[in-house]
């Protein structure tokens, strides 16, 4: 659960020693924090997706139907193997982006942070959903962590910028509306 508060201040004096960054540029400071938080969310999401895969493999090896472990069925193997591949690819990408964020100005890697955040948060939800499916009825109960993981990580697709906000950021960089490759605005044809 998250708390939401509304704060309002009037005629407040802030001593110079308490000012963070340049006056009038508070959004820059906040955006830097947002980028840091988004990459942390991405790392957490990849970690939990990895956990869901590992627990699914463990359960599939142990759970037997008709005398055979369900891990012997391709209908169980293939989705888990696909999820594992996605987790490992995204894990490498999140490490790469986190490294870039440590070395470069946040705005120069903002699109990469958005990609990592968007894909990792979706991956966590998909991995939790798969784990519930593999575990069957017990996977949906509170006796296993997957329903909680799904609920917790589903909110990451809303907080720190919704999926749509992340996609918009990616598109803005991709099409030259933002970032280092930003194209100058086209001049309007006045017909003269």
Located regions from the model:
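FAD-binding subdomain of flavoenzyme oxidoreductases
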Residues: 1-5
